[in-house]
Every structure is written in C-alpha cells, then in structure tokens.
C-alpha cells in the first residue's frame, strides 16, 4: 500500500458539494397524522361502550326534554360524560405524543456520530450528518461507514455488510487482483451503515443521505416500544387480573340494581329503560375507573422522563428494557481504561534497552509508522488526539521531544500491516527504510519479548523487574521491537506474525489516572449489593493496583480473587461456576473471556451489566442483560449495547442503576395509589347498588375520579426524581411480582378503611335524606381521601416525610390541579356533575378531617424510621 498525502475539500468546496448533493441525512418515512392517532383512542372497547351509552343517554334526555317537558338541565349529565371522555383521552394522547418526542432523540443521536475526515490538508472530526460528496474519510476497526465511498487505501479491511446484503464478513481491497466479480457491491466500495470489523482504510465519498444504497432501502430506526419487557409483561398480567375483578363487580352491580328496581318500583317501560341504561353506564364507568389504562401511560411517562434525565447524567438509553433492568443489576463487569480511569494517556517513562542514538531513532520511527492515530496541532500548546488514545499518547510524547511523526510517515512507505487485535495483543508494520524493509512491532511487552532474541538471562530479569515497577504504579506498558528483513523474507502469513528473532528496543510506561469520582461510585454499588468485576487487557499487577485505588481490592483478597484470561479459559465450566462469584479481576482478558464470564454469572441467576468499547466486545454486550457501550467506543459496540455511557465514567453507570431502581419504585407508587382507589370505588358503588337508593357516585363523578386516578396520578407519580436512598437497598429479584407484601398490605388496609368510612357515610346520608348537598359532600370526601393518599404513595418506601417534596415540581403541580379542579367542579359543576356549592366551613371540615390519612401515614413512617 502506498502512502498518500491528501488535501481533501476546502470550506468553499464543502458548501458547494452540500448544495449540489444534499446533506448526509436520511429522510424519515411519513408518520401517521396526529389527528388519526387521536381518533384511534376512541376505538378502545370500553370507550366505545361509554360513547354508545352516552349517545343513548342523550336520546333519553331528548325524550325527557321534548315529551315530558323537563328542563334543559336533563342534558347536563350526558354532556358531562362526553366532556370527561374527551378530557381523559385528550390528556392521555398529549402525553403519549410528548413521550414519542422524548424517544425520538435516539434516532437523532446517530447523525451526530463523529467521523474523521481530511479537509484543507488537516485531519479533523466532524458529525456524520456534515459529511459531503468528495470528502476524504478515514475509517478504522469498529467504525460505521458514514456514506457510500470509493476506497483509496485499505489494510486488512473486512466489512460487516449484513445490514444490506446479509454478509457478516466481506473483504475489501483496492488491489484489482483481489476484486470479487460476484460480489453484490464492488470490492473497492464501502457503504453507509456497514461496519469495519477489522483493518483500516481511506475512502472518498461518492453519495450521501438518501442517495446512498442504505438510503434507498431506509426505514427510520424507530424505538421498538412494542417489545414486551419483563416489567410490561408483569403489568399486563396485573391489568388483566384487575379487569376481570372489575367485570365481576360490574356484573354484580347490574344484578343488584335490577333486583332493587323490581323490589322498589312500579314497572314502567320508559322508566325501566332509563334505569337500565343508567345502570349499564354506572357499570361500564366503574370498569373504566377500575381498569388500569393509566398503567401503560405511567410506564411510558416514567421511561420518557427517565431517559431524558438519564441523558443529562451521561446515560443514553438505546433500548427500553435497559432502564428497568439496570435497577435489578447484581453484577457489573467493567473495563478499566476510560471507565475507571480518565483515559488521559500520557507517557510517564521510557526504558531503553540500548542507550545509543540509533536505538532512539528506531523507536521514534516505530511509534510514528506503527500507528493509525493523528494529532490535531492547530493549537501547538495543546495537541488534540484523533484516534486511539494510547497511540495518541505516544505521538504527543514525540511532539514533546520535538519529533515530527509525520516526517517519518512521509519518508517511509508502508509495505504491509498487521492491525492490533485483542487476541494477538500486538500490531506490526513493514516499511521501506532506505534500501531495506524493516518490521516494526508494538504490543504487550511480555508477548513482544517472547518473539525477540533473548538469550541474555539478565535482559529477561531486567524486563520483568521494570514491568513490576510500572505495574505497581498502575501504569500500562507497551513493548517495542524491530527487525531488518532480508529481501525475500516473509514475516506476515494469513494474519499472523511468523518471525521470532526480533530485537527488543524499549518499554514505554503510560499513566492513566483513576477518575476522582470512581472510588465513591464503586462504594455506592458495593453498598447497594452489586458486585463489581474488572475485566481488562492489562497485566495482573496493573489491574490489582487500580482495583486497590478504587476500593475494590482489599488486603484480605488473595489469588482466588484474580485470574488471567489464559488461566480463566483453561478452567472447566464447572470450575468457572464455582469460582466466578469470588473473582474481582480478570487480567490480560480477551473478548471471549468477558463473554464467558457474563454467561457463567447468568447461569447462577445473576443480572449482569457489562461495559465495552471495542468491536470485539460486541458478543459480551449482546449476551449481557444490559450492555453498556462507551461514548467514544466503536459503532459496532454501540449497536450491540443497550445504554451508551457518554462520558465513559463508571460513576455514570452507578447513576443508571439509581435511575433504574427509582423508575421501578415510581411505577410501584402509581400501582399502590391506583389499587387503593380501585378497592374503595368498587366496594362503595357495589354497596350502593344493593341499598336501593341513589348511587353514591354518578357517572361524571366517577370519570373525574378516573382522571385523577389514571392520568393525573401517572403524571404525578411516574415522574418523581430519583432518590439516592434506593442505593441502600439490595438488588430486587427480577422475577418477583411488582406488588410486594408491603404494598398488598397497604392496599388492603387503606382501601378497606376508605371503604368502611365511605360506606358508613353513605348509609348515614341515605337514611338521613340523600340530597344534592349530601352527594356533593360525599363526592368531595371521596376525592380528598385520595388526594391525601397521593402524598402517602409518593413517600412509599422512601423512609422520608410525605411533605418533603423539594424537587418534585411536577408532583406539586398535579396536586394543585386536582385540588383546584375539585373546588371548581363542586362550585360550578351543577347538574352536569350532580353537585352543588359547599359552605366554606364544610370545606374546612372535609380538608382537615380527610387529612388524617396523611397524618396516620406520617406517624407510621416516623415509627419505622426510629426502629
């Protein structure tokens, strides 16, 4: 492969190309119009029944108005029913649209992926969407191709074209002798959306956006919220259970009301039809109230809120299930570099095996040509690395030595390359050097040293001693070696280095400090019952020292808690299962070691989250319950992951666990509140049906209760901010039912207490004279009991006061809407809601009297906190 100097496009040429060929953005497919989506809400079977009942109610009201000459007030209730239906469906629709917009962010992020291009003779990074036709693009292992292009250079370039052709491995070349005449696309073409599995290259963009092959078959990558997560499945089962219960109650109400009619009324067809219609409407309304249609909305809102806020804490959720699963995580398998450390590589020391100038020049050239990274030196005082951080650190070291790495690259010509891989743990490059070919090798010192002429025992001891010193300081090390090749000598065969008589040049020690926030984040995870395991390519000594610095490795730990990748691979499956829970560190790990570790932990019932940033991490990311890719990781790793940690930091992973646990807790709070109201509403209406008096709650009143219980409660409780208190709990059992024992006891006791109070009040009012005023009192008492209970639901499992609402602006806003809404309905609802205005003194009695719900809850929480 020849070495080329590319100029690339100028700024003016970029603008001209974009105007001529368009931007590198795919046009989204046409969406369903909002009005159609809104109308779909009215095709719900229960809403249809309610609409039919409402229409029949209007018919009867017309008969009463036109034939019986009753006043226009007969229309208030049916009109109220329709307003309540519109309000409930409308609010649900608005929040569904809002949630969709929250999720749409994931589809935009892909257009912001950084791409390395050459423009104005300078290598720079630009967002994928800014790539234009004619751009010179550099591609490397793990990259996703930004636009269709013609290869100008290619080194061991293997592409995954499965997204277009189904071919997982497709060899690419610029050598016409290697062209495949039967290939679906030309061998020297790379295509948008395909991924570099191995090697690197340079291409010139031929087509962007919709003009690419990918664009021609594009369907917008929408979030698939039809996929049922374990939480969704649990909620579906719960919803069906409640629905069946509510149907049974509704059936009993119809039976009871019909019996009461024949026992207490003279038969009259018009009266009977009106009575039956009212009965059916009450029964259907009770079903509407009882059926938890707010559950899906609570989950959607909670996910949308969590995903948006998690993005602010550097967690980009790519797949829905990941939010809830992070909350159940029991083990986190993490990389070291960039996740536990700052990924700010700098050369701390260079140990030369030979101290002459020729040796130094060989090392300089080795570093310069054996690298795919480049430096952006537009700011001479602070060069910016484009590419691999480790290789960048070496180039910056050359820069500080006043050595221009580009001079070595232009003076030599690369003849052959063997790219770095985690399996071989080294890379090799053959270049022309004067009249000779020189092989330069860079990689793990012990692996490179094995291929060197090392007859000198003292040299071996010196190497081991120096490596130990560096490892005890948690430095990562690289070894450098070379060989001048004879004219006919072959050193790379079938992707393997076949030379073992190299000359060792030096060890370079690179420091990468631990992130300041990581020790505390690791402690939080350990306190939360989550095991942390480091899986790294570094030596055992380096990994152990990093483990000590972050608080994972303690003085009591021994060799049972650490293992090398080779030793781990040699264990039988049974031995792995016996030892895997004790392991804290796997050093010199390879990608398949990480995958095997994850599978072994899963076989023991653990919920595993795993980090990865490279292409070879994809298998482990896919098999884990939650795959966590790094923000600067490869596109292949991100594609396989569920969450992208934008800042790469372990502390962000800890925050993702907190969000996952809080999300689950918020949904539990919503269920707790809703089922408590369900129990009270069903028992009160059922009791009223068999008393032969007026029904305690009218249809419009129950629809207002439904609006509070479903829509408003979902908005208030599903979007509560996360609490660090959840990190003091142990991980929940992922298979456990969402209603735990404490919740069930709370629902039964509180719901039962409310029912007793409301039935006693109803019995008293019914026998004392059930007037419109008494109905208004009763309706307000019912709502205010639920109002105060919402505060208790918010405080559920926090151990804190329900009045501690700092930071809960959404909750307070909804509480205000419910309170003001109840006052307005009672004051101005009139015959539409079957209410009349209440005296101020009665408002004071009701508000203070029903608040006992809150004070009893506060007392119980106070006692529990003191225990």
Say what each PLM segment does.
Residues 732-753, 770-777:
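Membrane-water interface at loop-to-transmembrane-helix junctions
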Residues 1-731, 738-739, 752, 763-764, ...:
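Conserved cytosolic headpiece of P-type ATPases
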Residues 762-770:
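Long hydrophobic segments that form regular secondary structure
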Residues 709, 754-755, 776-791:
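Generic alpha-helical transmembrane segments
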């Amino acid at each position: 492969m020849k070495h080329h100097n590319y100029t690339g496009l100028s700024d003016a040429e970029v603008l001209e190309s974009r105007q001529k060929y368009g931007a590198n953005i795919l046009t989204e497919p046409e969406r369903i119009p909002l009005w159609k989506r809104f109308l779909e809400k009215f095709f719900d079977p229960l809403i249809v029944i309610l609409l039919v009942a409402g229409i029949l109610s209007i018919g009867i009201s017309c008969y009463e108005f036109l034939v019986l000459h009753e006043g226009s007030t007969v229309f208030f209730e049916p009109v109220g029913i329709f307003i309540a239906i519109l309000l409930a469906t409308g609010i649900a629709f608005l929040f569904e649209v809002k949630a969709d917009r929250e999720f749409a962010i994931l589809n935009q992020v892909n257009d912001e992926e950084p791409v390395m291009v050459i423009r104005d003779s300078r290598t720079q990074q630009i967002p994928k969407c800014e790539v234009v036709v004619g751009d010179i693009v550099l591609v490397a292992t793990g990259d996703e191709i930004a636009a269709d292009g013609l290869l100008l250079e290619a080194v061991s370039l293997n592409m995954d074209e499965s997204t277009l052709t189904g071919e997982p491995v497709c060899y690419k070349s610029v050598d016409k002798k290697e062209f495949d005449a039967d290939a679906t696309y030309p061998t020297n073409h790379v295509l948008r959306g395909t991924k570099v599995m191995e090697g690197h290259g340079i291409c010139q963009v031929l087509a962007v956006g919709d003009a690419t092959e990918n664009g021609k078959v594009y369907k917008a990558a929408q979030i698939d919220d039809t996929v049922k997560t374990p939480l969704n499945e649990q909620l579906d089962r719960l919803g069906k259970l409640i629905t069946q219960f509510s149907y049974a109650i509704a059936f009993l109400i119809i039976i009871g009301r019909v019996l009461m009619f024949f026992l207490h009324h003279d038969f009259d067809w018009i009266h009977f039809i009106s009575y039956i219609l009212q009965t059916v409407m009450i029964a259907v309304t009770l079903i509407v109230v009882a059926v938890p249609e707010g559950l899906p909305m609570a989950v959607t809102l909670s996910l949308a809120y969590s995903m948006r806020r998690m993005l602010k804490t550097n967690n980009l959720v790519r797949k829905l299930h990941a939010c809830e699963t992070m909350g159940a995580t029991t083990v986190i398998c993490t990389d070291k570099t960039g996740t536990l450390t700052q990924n700010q590589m700098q050369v701390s020391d260079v140990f030369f095996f030979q101290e002459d100038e020729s040796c130094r020049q060989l090392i300089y050239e080795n570093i310069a040509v054996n690298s795919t990274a480049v430096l952006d030196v537009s700011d001479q005082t602070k060069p910016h690395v484009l590419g691999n951080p480790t290789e960048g650190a070496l180039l910056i070291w050359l820069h500080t030595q006043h050595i221009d790495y580009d001079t070595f690259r232009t003076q030599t010509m690369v003849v052959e390359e063997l790219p770095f891989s985690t399996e071989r743990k080294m890379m090799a490059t053959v270049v022309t050097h004067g009249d000779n070919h020189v092989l330069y090798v860079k990689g793990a010192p012990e692996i490179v040293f094995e291929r060197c002429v090392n007859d000198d025992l003292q040299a071996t001891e010196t190497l081991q001693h120096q490596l130990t010193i560096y490892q005890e300081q948690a430095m990562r090390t690289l070894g450098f070696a070379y060989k001048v090749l004879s004219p006919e000598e072959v050193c790379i065969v079938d992707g393997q280095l076949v030379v073992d008589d190299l000359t060792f040049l030096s060890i370079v020690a690179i420091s990468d400090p631990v992130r300041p926030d990581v020790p505390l984040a690791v402690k939080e995870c350990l306190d939360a019952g989550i095991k942390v395991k480091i899986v790294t390519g570094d030596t055992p000594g380096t990994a152990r020292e990093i483990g000590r610095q972050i608080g994972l490795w303690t003085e009591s730990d021994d060799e049972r808690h650490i293992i090398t990748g080779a030793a781990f691979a040699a264990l039988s499956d049974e031995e792995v299962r016996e030892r895997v829970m004790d392991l804290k560190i796997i050093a010199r790990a390879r990608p398949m070691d990480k995958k095997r570790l994850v599978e072994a932990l899963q076989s023991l019932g653990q919920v595993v989250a795993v980090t990865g940033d490279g292409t070879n991490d994809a298998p482990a990311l896919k098999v884990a319950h939650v795959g966590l890719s790094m923000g600067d990781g490869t596109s292949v790793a991100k594609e396989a992951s569920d969450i992208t940690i934008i800042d790469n930091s372990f502390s962000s992973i800890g925050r993702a666990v907190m969000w996952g646990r809080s999300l689950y807790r918020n949904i539990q709070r919503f269920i707790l509140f809703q089922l408590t109201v369900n129990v009270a509403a069903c028992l009160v209406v059922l009791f009223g049906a068999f008393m032969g008096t007026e029904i305690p709650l009218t249809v419009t009143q129950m629809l207002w209760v439904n609006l509070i219980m479903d829509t408003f409660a979902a908005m208030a409780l599903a979007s509560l901010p996360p609490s660090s208190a959840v990190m003091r709990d142990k991980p929940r059992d992922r298979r456990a039912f969402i209603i735990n024992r404490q919740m069930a006891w709370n629902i039964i006791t509180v719901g039962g207490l409310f029912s007793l109070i409301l039935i006693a009040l109803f019995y008293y009012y019914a026998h004392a004279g059930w007037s419109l005023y008494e109905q208004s009192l009763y309706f307000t008492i019912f709502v205010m009991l639920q109002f105060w209970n919402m505060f208790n639901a918010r405080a559920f499992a926090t151990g804190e006061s329900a009045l501690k609402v700092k930071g809960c602006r959404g909750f307070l806003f909804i509480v205000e809407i419910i309170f003001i809404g109840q006052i307005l309905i009672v004051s101005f609802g009139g015959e539409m809601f079957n209410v009349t205005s209440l005296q101020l003194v009665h408002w004071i009695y009701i508000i203070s009297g029903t608040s006992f719900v809150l004070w009893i809850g506060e007392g119980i929480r106070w006692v529990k906190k003191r225990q």
